[in-house]
Amino acid sequence: LGLMTGSEGLLGVITEVTVKILKTPEVVKAALVGFPTIEDAGKCVAQIIAEGCIPAGMEIMDKALTKATNDYSKAGYPTDAEAMMIIEFDGTEHDVEADMNKAKKIAEENNSSSLKISKSNSERLKFWAGRKAAFPACGVLAPDYMCMDGSIPRGKLAEVLKEISRLSKKYDLPVANAFHAGDGNLHPLIMFDANNEESLKKTEEFGAEILKYCVKVGGALT
């Protein structure tokens, strides 16, 4: 479907779509979970999915992006954590409670440093409002940023994030990580100055290495 959509009509034309209408969930809750390392957050994601605990949404941001987003949108994210995860469940009250408790237990097994569950729908929406403001918030970190887009197996999240950190040091360029953790879709944001030719050159090389590594671990360019 992604290939067909991305081809913009070149590979074919969709003439009919059948959709299934779902009931509005009885209960929707989200949680903010802090971690001491981004690798811990990646391992937590892989374990949550492996144990059959399927969330309605699951996103991760690193410390640099969390701080920028807090400054930009006053989202109230944990500022002392190296990585932060937003995880959301919907369904019946019983199912949501069971899933949230299971996710909390898995997070604790992966060294979570904090966990805050939404107490109202407005608080839940506030959690997500910060994530949606993440990209514009990058304006406080650098004059420009280049967004990479790659998908990897969820079990490889911790490994790939560790490699991105290594490459950041290699190229001496800051990187802010945001990604759709539930499906392994990464968006590393490389901070640079487009008016500096050397900075732009290093950024392009850095980005290419990230995407090559995504493919190396069994992922794809998206």
Predicted segments — roles?
Residues 1-222:
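Noncatalytic alpha-helical scaffold of FAD-dependent oxidoreductases
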